[in-house]
Amino acid sequence: MQLRSRLLKSIHTLSALIAVPLALASGAAHAGTLLLGTYPDKLFTVDDTSGAVKDKVKLDAGLPVSLRLSDDHKKIYATTITTSGIVVLDADTRKILNQFSLNTPTVRYRFMGGVPDPSGRYFYTVLIRFDKLNDRYTVSKQQYAVIDLMQKKIVRTVDMEAQDDALPGGFRASLMLSPDGKTLYMFKSKVLVIDTASLKVVDRIDLQKADAAGYEDVALGGGVEGLQLTHPNELVSLFTAADPYVHNKIFGLGRFDLTARKFTFTPIGPITNQISGLEVTPDGKTAYTTATNGLTGSKRCEFWKFDLTSLKLTDKQEFHCRSRYTLGMSQDGAKLYIYGASYDIEVYDAGTLKYEKTWDLGADATMAGMLALH
């Protein structure tokens, strides 16, 4: 009896020792951190398991309006609207590495985001400059700009050509950089291909004349998450288009090869009132967006799930609408988030598209986007 008791005790002890690392491994597989901007001047980090706010990083540069993770996932770049500032943070520690403002008492800038070069030295953006003179203000044309993050100043600008300035999208258009840092892409109703050495447009890719033959008014689908990298050379996004005969609006999935400069478009179905961004799972096989139909009291919002291998819509589910919101995803692709212009984050299961819970942030989240970090 004593032998059996000792044996059972040993088995229980061994089971406990095995269970601990398994539990830790299971927790580590799903544990992550969300980073998002809040009013008036902070970045919050949120535990993506409990929803608890872990850090509140104050930005002297003001209100964050865009967030971007470097391609190597080592740095975070935030831009602010209060002082036209740039903040660089360490992605692991969330500590501020660099922070400065471009505005002066007589000069103001306005830009919404941008993209760092592979070295992390320069930051490319599109901006407008406002000069305060003795008797008036002057406003520049839209300009391509290079910001030296070490010198903390704008080192090069080139005015945007009138034909490109007139394209829909404004200075909120998405920017991407080629892997070698030699080419900047600006996604409007055309893709502007810009040489980073001269800041001159060297090519204009008309999307309706690419592999989207038979369609007109092909344009990038909106949202701060509009462009997603499925691998270092390829972007995937939602695009909208219309047939050239009765002009019915449709949407589809588009892929853009940053190296070959090749665009492919696969139509999926009729367009809704609004399509908000695209979130792609880490394995690049599944993507999610939200679609809105109707207005005000008759508004209906749905999650749409896509298989990126077959390029088909595989599932959809209605969820509670908000007047304004942004779609986000956890770093493991298991959860979807509805957030922005509110004090909370709604959590949904990505597999079932069902509501799970709401996390209270205790602060008003901006529309700067959300980064899912390990």
Label each region the model flagged.
Residues 52-58, 95-104, 153-166, 200-205, ...:
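A short beta-strand motif characteristic of beta-propeller blades
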Residues 62-69, 107-116, 165-176, 212-229, ...:
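Repeated scaffold domains used in trafficking and secretory/extracellular systems
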Residues 31-33, 72-74, 119-121, 180-182, ...:
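Short coil/turn segments that connect the beta-strands within blades of beta-propeller domains
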